[in-house]
From Swiss-Prot:
PROSITE patterns from the UniProt entry: RIBOSOMAL_S18
Classification via HAMAP family: Ribosomal_bS18 (MF_00270)
This protein's GO CC annotations: cytosolic small ribosomal subunit
Source species: Rhizobium etli (strain ATCC 51251 / DSM 11541 / JCM 21823 / NBRC 15573 / CFN 42)
Keyword entries, A-Z: Ribonucleoprotein, Ribosomal protein, RNA-binding, rRNA-binding
Stated role: Binds as a heterodimer with protein bS6 to the central domain of the 16S rRNA, where it helps stabilize the platform of the 30S subunit.
Keyword rRNA processing: no
SUPFAM superfamilies per UniProt: Ribosomal protein S18 (SSF46911)
Subunit and partners: Part of the 30S ribosomal subunit. Forms a tight heterodimer with protein bS6.
Protein known as: Small ribosomal subunit protein bS18
Family: Belongs to the bacterial ribosomal protein bS18 family.
Region (Disordered): 1-20
Length: 82
């Protein structure tokens, strides 16, 4: 007998598409003064986390990056974390 026929058959895994956390009726607004919200989208080293990880839409990712850069310029967020 062949060994391949005794192995269990795996079903393909269907990953559910994440929705953008900034779209919807009661979604938070992206504001450069809201440091607590912006820190959720910055890595522990201070880099902006990509949208493929955070599931933020392309339009909102650009707004988020602009708000983070503005907050960095004003000294509300660090550029790098040592």
């Amino acid at each position: 007998m062949s060994e391949a026929s005794s192995a269990p058959v795996r079903r393909p895994f269907h990953r559910r598409r994440k929705t953008c956390p900034f779209s919807g009726a009661n979604a938070p607004r992206i504001d450069y003064k809201d440091v607590r919200l912006l820190q959720r989208y910055i890595s522990e080293r201070g880099k902006i986390v990509p949208s493929r990880i955070t599931a933020v839409s392309q339009k909102k990712q650009r707004e988020l990056a602009q708000a983070i850069k503005r907050a960095r310029f004003l000294g509300l967020l660090p550029y790098v974390v040592a």
